[in-house]
C-alpha cells in the first residue's frame, strides 16, 4: 500500500470516528511520500514558504526536541477531494505542536516558514482521536492564511 493510500485509509477511519471534527494525523503519516507543494500552506508556496521537503524536515526537528511531546497535521475540510482524484494529496490546514515551551519559544521555531503564527488549542475543536497533551504541555496550532 502506498503512503498516500495508507493516509487516505486512516483519514476515512478518523472521519467515521468523529465526523464533527477535522482529522489529525502524525507528522510522518502526512509527509511521507508527499511531494505536492500546494497540499499545505498553498498561499505561501512560491511566496517565501520553503519547499515541502524542507517544511517536513523543520517540523521533524521540532518533534525531536525534548520539550515537544509530538507534532501532528490537522487536515483541511477539503481533504476528501483526494478520494476522488488519484493525483491529489489530502489538503492540510495546520500543524499542531504539543509542547511545554512558551509561546515566544514556539514562535521562534517557526522563523522562515512564512506561517501566520501559532495559537493555543485546537482551532476547530479537538478530534476524538487527537492526542492529549501531557501534564504541563499544551497544543500550539501553526497556521497559514
Where do the model's predicted regions map?
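A generic structural motif
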Residues: 93-98, 140-142
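Long, contiguous N-terminal structural blocks used for assembly/anchoring
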Residues: 1-96, 105-109
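Acidic, proline/glycine-rich low-complexity IDRs
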Residues: 113-145
